[in-house]
Amino acid sequence: MADGISSVDVQGTVTAEEWRARVDLAALYRLTALYGWDDMIFTHISMRVPGPDHHFLINPYGMFFEEMTASSLVKVDLEGNVVNQTDALVNPAGFTIHSAVHMAREDAKCVMHVHTDDGVAVSAQSHGLLPISQTGMIAMAGVAYHGYEGVALDLDERDRIVADMGEKSLLILRNHGTLACGESAGETFMRMFFLERACTMQVRALSAGRENLIECDDDLQDVVKGQSSPAGMKMLADMLAWPGLLRKLDREMPGYDT
């Protein structure tokens, strides 16, 4: 890889379980680029490495999401130490955010953070996500909020991120962006898909003025929440959407699994 970012094939040096995690995470990076959610070299997605060591995989700082491969991912521990042989750097803000969630949430095997225009726009709206679309109400059931503290370089912020997120699977970081977590790459992508689509719909709808919008009441929000269970989301993601997303990726942006 040009400009100092090397990508040596590591498949033969890691376990089969880690390799599967690497392939899924590289696919998730490329899908993020394919859907237009990337932010040049900024933002990050991580995946816990199966096993007892509490390591996780994250992108090498400086590599575009569309370039990501299974072998190029960096393995770090919860102290921020790189534990595989690589010269790559890790975005320190990315480490703060992702290590916070991985340390606190055993179920958060994958953590995804993006800075889309619409996601940031909604993060800056005092009312947050509104119940104005079916997609929005599905996302709202799992959303928490975290106030902006500046670029996430202070490791002490990890405790506050975790406290604000609680047991939710989605986090809107005020004036900053969005975050999703899940037990798999597919589940995490699907959760982010609903949140980002909801943000786009909201930004467009608000162009008519909030006073002209139909906001669904609490009872209707409860109905939608009951119809969109976490188990249903996982099945929808892992069994139906993710295989299709990989087929799409193989057609349009192959090479992630190297």
Which role fits each region the language model picked out?
Residues 2-31, 169-172, 178-258:
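A conserved C-terminal secondary-structure "cap"
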Residues 14-19, 84-92, 143-152:
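Flexible, glycine/proline-enriched loop segments at strand-loop-helix junctions
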Residues 22-112, 119-130, 134-136:
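An anion-binding catalytic pocket shared by soluble metabolic enzymes
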Residues 117-157:
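Class I SAM-dependent methyltransferase SAM-binding "motif I" and its flanking Rossmann-like core
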Residues 144-180:
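A contiguous binding-surface segment within folded domains or other stable secondary-structure elements
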